[in-house]
Design a protein with these regions (language model features):
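NAD(P)+-binding Rossmann beta1-loop-alpha1 motif at the extreme N-terminus of oxidoreductases
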Residues: 1-44
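Rossmann-like NAD(P)-binding element
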Residues: 45-85, 91-96
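Rossmann-like adenosine-cofactor binding region
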Residues: 68-79, 92-99, 104-106, 223-227, ...
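Rossmann-fold NAD(P)-binding glycine/threonine-rich loop
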Residues: 82, 90-131, 135-139
């Protein structure tokens, strides 16, 4: 597939490396320019391009950008064909993104992103730490393979996203409509807890919007309690412990 990744940070860089390594034709763009794309992001064959070129003639576009800024790309996406699959990886943290009243009033995070962008999106890759994504992807069929939820309103676009999740080394789970994607947002039981395909459905079902938002908003204090240099394993355990 011809894929563009917009955003060359930890998540975007991981996806560019893994998807190009899996044989896809991958381009990477960053709002700061091509020079902002680190050489290691391109080490498996991805190419750095200008942002204006990132959405041209693509089968899929992955948004690996901060939550709440998708509206800045609305003009860029205005001419993108409807059949191009657009995937959103972002997460809403008020202490990082600023308080967004629409979300606080109940608009689901990726529904908000879709509205800003002016087109449908599929939610994927948001519910795993960047380090989990970088180091723990394994071939299909491997016992204990970590699962990633995928939510969206089109069965076909979800199938595309789920195939790409599999290509990055994780089992994909159909988590329902985009309106249900709040269940995989911070800090629900399914968020960054490294669950298998058998474990993930129950975690999504156990999500509680009020409780999970309260846990999310306490994250600065929770991280501080982990000390100066927490490991990814420490973070996963912290997330799991929040729901025991």
């Amino acid at each position: 597939m011809k894929i563009s990744v917009i955003g060359a940070g930890a998540i975007g860089g991981n996806l560019a490396r893994k998807l190009s390594g899996a044989g896809h034709d991958v381009e990477v763009a960053d709002a700061r320019g091509r020079e902002a794309v680190a050489p290691e992001v391109l080490e498996t064959g991805a190419r750095a391009v200008a942002l204006d070129d990132a959405v041209k003639d693509k089968d899929a576009v992955i948004l690996a950008i901060p939550f709440g800024v998708a509206g800045q790309l609305a003009d860029l996406f205005a001419s993108v064909p409807a059949e191009t699959v657009v995937m959103d990886t972002s997460n809403y943290y008020p202490h990082l993104n600023g308080r967004i009243e629409a979300v606080e009033d109940g608009v689901v995070e990726s529904v908000y992103t879709s509205e800003l962008l002016g087109r449908p999106v599929v939610k994927a890759w948001n519910a795993a730490l960047s380090e989990t994504q970088r180091t723990k992807g394994v071939p299909a069929g491997t016992p204990g393979r970590i699962a990633i939820p995928v939510a969206g309103d089109s069965e076909e676009t979800k199938r595309v996203a789920m195939r790409l999740v599999d290509d990055t080394g994780f089992d994909a789970y159909d988590a329902g409509a985009l309106a249900d994607s709040w269940r995989q947002q911070p800090m629900g039981p399914a968020y960054c807890t490294e669950l298998t395909l058998d474990e993930l459905p129950a975690a999504l079902a156990a999500a509680d919007r009020v409780k999970d938002a309260a846990v999310r908003d306490s994250m600065p204090e929770r991280f501080a309690a982990l000390g100066a240099n927490p490991t990814p394993e420490d973070v996963v355990e912290m997330n799991r412990a929040a729901h025991r």
